[in-house]
Swiss-Prot record:
A Pfam cross-reference name: ODAD1_CC
Cytoplasm found in the keyword field: yes
Principal location listed in the UniProt entry: cytoplasm
Protein name listed in UniProt: Outer dynein arm-docking complex subunit 1
Subunit structure: Component of the outer dynein arm-docking complex along with ODAD2, ODAD3, ODAD4 and CLXN. Interacts with ODAD3. Interacts with ODAD4; this interaction may facilitate the recruitment and/or attachment of outer dynein arm docking complex proteins,including ODAD1, ODAD3, and ODAD4 to ciliary axonemes. Interacts with DNAH9. Interacts with MNS1. Interacts with PIERCE1 and PIERCE2; the interactions link the outer dynein arms docking complex (ODA-DC) to the internal microtubule inner proteins (MIP) in cilium axoneme.
Entry's Gene Ontology cellular component terms: axoneme; cilium; outer dynein arm; outer dynein arm docking complex
Modification sites for Phosphoserine: 536, 542-543, 545
Organism: Rattus norvegicus (Rat)
Region (Disordered): 271-290, 531-550, 571-694
Cysteines engaged in disulfide bonds, as pairs: none
One BP annotation, GO: outer dynein arm assembly
Biased composition (Low complexity): 628-642, 673-687
Amino acid sequence: MRLGLSSRSARSEEGSEIFLEGPVDGELSRLHRQRKVMELERRAYSREVHQRIRKQVEEIRQLEMLRAKLQMQINVAQTQVKRLGDKKRLADMDHLLKCRAQVQIEIEALQEQNRALEKQIQDWETHILTQSKDISTPDVILDQKMKIQRRIRILEDQLDRVTCHFDIHLVRNAALREELELLRIERGRYLNMDRKLKKEIHLLQEMVGALSTSSTSAYTAREEAKTKMGMLQERAEKELAQSDTEAQILLRQISHLEQLHRFLKLKNHDRQPDPGVVQKEEQRAWETSEGLRKTSQEKLVLRYEDTLNKLAQLTGESDPDLLVEKYLELEERNFAEFNFINEQNSELYHLQEEIKEMQEALVSEHASQDKQSLEREQQCKVLQQDVEKVCSESERLEARFQVLRVQLEKIKTDIQVLFDKAQCDNSVIKDLLGVKTYMRDRDIGLFLSTIEKRLVQLLTVQAFLEVQNNVPLADAALLALGQSIQEPPKKTTPLKPPDTMEDSSGVVIKDDYPMSKEELLSQVMKLVQLQDEEGSPKKRDSSPSLTLSSPRISLAAASVHARKASVVPESILSHKTGRGRGTGSISHVTFGDSASAPGPVTLASTSASGLPVSGRGSQGGRGAFKHTSSSSYLGSTGYLETSRGRESGTGGGHSQSMGSEMSRGFSSGSGQTSSAAPASRPSSATSKDSRGYN
């Protein structure tokens, strides 16, 4: 139901609308054009980004295929190269880790710079909105501006997400390019090493082939020389034995003849010869003279002739000169062969020495290779131990991550259940996040801020209903703060809300102009009189009060109180439309402690036009009644930080947010309680009534 509207305020508002109609239309058309241009730029940029991402994904896929192929080739050839490249891989890993740490530092610096820029942008926006609040504009224009700003922020958020995604892909592409470049360098080194090893193996094979050929030929020549040496040795032995035999025979004959000659001389000198012997000698001499008896020379000649005949039969040559020439030729040939055999034996000895030296070198090389292989195996064992340690650490961290993930999923499920039970408004969440069937990790703050907003709404409604039931303001304040009336506030650890939480709205007053002090007091007095006339005193609900430590809300009792409150006419909880524009505002009610020093009750209401109206009452304690526009809910989304609203009160600049009150706890024993709603447009502290109070 619409509240009373004075003629003076209506005339002033109509005059301001006529006066501001032209500039507002121009500004609105300019904003529409700017929005269209930004939409076209966003679409073009989105298409370009998606096309670039597709190209990069295709390139990444091709590079991964090439990497898999190279990895397969490297694994095939990794038997020898792996041992040689362990140290280089460790150095590369160290370098990559250092690069990763440096990149993380750079990313953090960029994030800090981005946050500083966002804060500066928000400060400028706050300054612009503060300057624009002095101009009284219609509610529709401001509502459209807020919607445009919210849409711009949503688009900026989406653009920021796409940009982050694009930056992540760029970083991954850079890492893959670096890894690919390292793999190419490693492949080139491996190919160079492979070519060198193949050349060395080829040279060794040629050397081994030449050595085997030379050793085979040397062995064959050695065997032939051995055979010839054996034959010559046997022949020399035979000739030596034959010459020794002939020499012995000749020596025996000579000695026999000498003995015989000496004996004959001795006999001849000693005695007279025997007549028979003399006769025999004479007869031998006569036979010799007659040629009947052959001498020793004749016998030797006959023997030589017999030997020549045998040689002629064996060789087929009867000429003694030719036999002598052939014999000399054979002797020369045998001597040449003997010299050749001696040379071959000396060369064979040198080759054997060289073979022995090469065998010793091969043994030493094998020993060094075995030593290097043992060292590599030890290094591999050490690296394997390090890898096992890292794997165990990663498994431990993965298990811990899984446990934390399960806890987080449970928390998300509980938050969703609490969100559904509290019947929170999810329209803003759908506008920001779209229709999703699941909750992301970064959306938890958004859901918690929405739940807390709903909780404060229910607490405020309950406190207002208790005030209607003539409950003291101190008890109503305790109920609004979620504390029990009978029990003193317990010292419990409060739940710390997110930093971007917007102050929860309380009583909703849908009005198109700010209410004055007299109008607000008249409305409250009418409500009290109507309740007294209706008679039946309302009993307080026996359900346990709501506390922040255990957020359990009795929705049935809240709905009953809401139905009872809706029956009362001229209620400040009812929504009304003004001049067909349907603009609404949300009021926030906070009550101070009755034990505090008496002071004025400040009832401030800010409409969509941003004009504050304050009132003064005579009740004890302090209270503040302040409403903010519904479009300021963007401050609690968790994506955009909004500036905190300020609230000026009597006795000094006492301003604090709802989140700071909750972080300090409600059981601190403070004598006064105040709440301010952080919005995207902080309320100005230069209102007329507040200046009057100050």
